[in-house]
Amino acid sequence: MIQVLLVTICLAVFPYQGSSIILESGNVNDYEVMYPQKVAALPKGAVQQKYEDTMQYEFKVNGEPVVLHLEKNKGLFSEDYSETHYSPDGREITTNPPVEDHCYYHGRIQNDADSTASISACNGLKGHFKLQGEMYLIEPLKFSDSEAHAVYKYENVEKEEEAPKMCGVTQTNWESDEPIKKASKLVVTAEQQRFPRRYIKLAIVVDHGIVTKHHGNLKKIRKWIYQLVNTINNIYRSLNILVALVYLEIWSKQNKITVQSASNVTLDLFGDWRESVLLKQRSHDCAQLLTTIDFDGPTIGKAYTASMCDPKRSVGIVQDYSPINLVVAVIMTHEMGHNLGIPHDGNSCTCGGFPCIMSPMISDPPSELFSNCSKAYYQTFLTDHKPQCILNAPSKTDIVSPPVCGNELLEAGEECDCGSPENCQYQCCDAASCKLHSWVKCESGECCDQCRFRTAGTECRAAESECDIPESCTGQSADCPTDRFHRNGQPCLYNHGYCYNGKCPIMFYQCYFLFGSNATVAEDDCFNNNKKGDKYFYCRKENEKYIPCAQEDVKCGRLFCDNKKYPCHYNYSEDLDFGMVDHGTKCADGKVCSNRQCVDVNEAYKSTTVFSLI
């Protein structure tokens, strides 16, 4: 039996809590200083590794003791991992660096079933962990004493006030343009959640802007990428996907394509380059470009949808937008999700009350959870598209092994795997056999509680607005009934708006969303710009032509807001809908925007009663 080294590290909290400090993540308000003290006891005859297979940390967070278990991520690299950069004179330099004894770990908090951790132990402890639903970051402090570490909540990192950042994907239907429309398609049963094992061999390309940003420090760039993939690998475990980094290319001399702010153009160019150049020099399943370019509008990432294994389209582009590694990792995970056939989440998609990773806007803090909808779409993608390239594990690795009950990976023949019996936190699962207990009715869902259906009448989805209707469990299913809402056209918000698909869209809230709390709706004269009929100001686009708004429709075109500094402020994006007045918005007394026209509310909704979102 192979003996595994167990290391215990006691973290002593420094006598004070800091109020503000500048760290790699940015300016941090409220942090704790800790000193890791490593105590190791090697079993007799054990071989010393630079980085142990497993480690355990005991420390306090907010005065409460926690135990953090870490396990080396042995699926992070393929054994034949290689990387390429370019010399100052343009020569290609390709190496196969040793990666077996690396320093990247996944982990969990003892007695917290929903906890996660992604940690680098290369030079101190650096990364993030989720504790009791809150995200914490940890990193070494750059004092003369190298043992000092800062631990702080993600929410305590100061962030610039700006419009929300979002994915640039606007068409997320299947290639046949036939979206999944039935609610039953978005119900993920316990059986469906036992996804088959899949492997994504990932190639990452780093553009020259990032090299410049890090002053040519390739070692620092590598560490940034390795931690990105460590987090991505951890997130995709919930879909039983192993993401292994097989190749890294750093454009240290110059970019190989024209990386530009037009995200659709950059995505197209990168796809062409991947097909014609990259695939010929390194086998892989999916390629992601990481860049410092500021894409047009609020876009921070874009990818082709349902494209995994396609020679050109199995790609994505990601802006290296944040100094927090977790944020960039989540963006790349999101774009890879599109490659796997997962569209953006709609209003009916849930993650147990937490934000979801496939929301079109990145949440704060960023989510590591796939929604019920995402899981159903991924399952459908596997069934309908049958992507062949992700069937096989990365070559020359020991990642593929016979099923092992207790390794927390769902493998062939297992119904569940919650770890060893002493560490299992999942009561539905018999840890000794990796089978579900015979009394289990459900494993997950809004109406599933401790493996049994919730009592009929238990509210499972609260009303989001006065236009929405709360839903309750039936007592016969783990899933919350399909979302329902009040009839479209019903007055709301004291007659400032009319209900539309469960919401009360008004311009004031749309301005708040785009430009922050100081913004309000602009004066009427600003909306007259929509009569111009150019690429910025219009009502509709037909046959590549911008159709100007008629006078009565000007408040159904581009949205104008007054943010004090600019009285006719607007937002432009490649997305035809972004920055436009939302459908269903009140444009005059008794009228709403419908198909970019200001029409009578009764005429707009004459055939509707109660709708359900899908």
From Swiss-Prot:
Motif window: D/ECD-tripeptide: 466-468
Modified residues (Pyrrolidone carboxylic acid): 192
Compartments (UniProt record): Secreted
Enzyme Commission code: 3.4.24.-
Cofactor note: Binds 1 zinc ion per subunit.
Active site: 335
Main location: secreted
Source domain of life: Eukaryota
UniProt keyword list: Calcium, Cell adhesion impairing toxin, Disulfide bond, Glycoprotein, Hemorrhagic toxin, Hemostasis impairing toxin, Hydrolase, Metal-binding, Metalloprotease, Platelet aggregation inhibiting toxin, Protease, Pyrrolidone carboxylic acid, Secreted, Signal, Toxin, Zinc, Zymogen
Family matches, as Gene3D superfamilies: Collagenase (Catalytic Domain), Disintegrin domain
Binding site for Ca(2+): 404, 407, 409, 411, 414, 417
Disintegrin domain location: 402-488
Cofactor: Zn(2+)
InterPro entries, sorted: ADAM_Cys-rich, Disintegrin_CS, Disintegrin_dom, Disintegrin_dom_sf, MetalloPept_cat_dom_sf, Peptidase_M12B, Peptidase_M12B_N, Reprolysin_adamalysin
Disulfide bonds: 309-389, 349-373, 351-356, 405-424, 405-434, 416-429, 416-434, 418-424, 428-451, 442-448, 447-473, 460-480, 467-492, 467-499, 492-504, 499-504, 511-526, 511-561, 526-568, 539-549, 549-556, 556-593, 561-568, 587-598, 593-598
MF term (GO), any: metal ion binding
UniProt similarity note: Belongs to the venom metalloproteinase (M12B) family. P-III subfamily. P-IIIb sub-subfamily.
Protein name per UniProt: Zinc metalloproteinase-disintegrin-like HR1b
Species in which this protein is naturally found: Protobothrops flavoviridis
Taxonomic lineage of the native organism: Eukaryota, Metazoa, Chordata, Craniata, Vertebrata
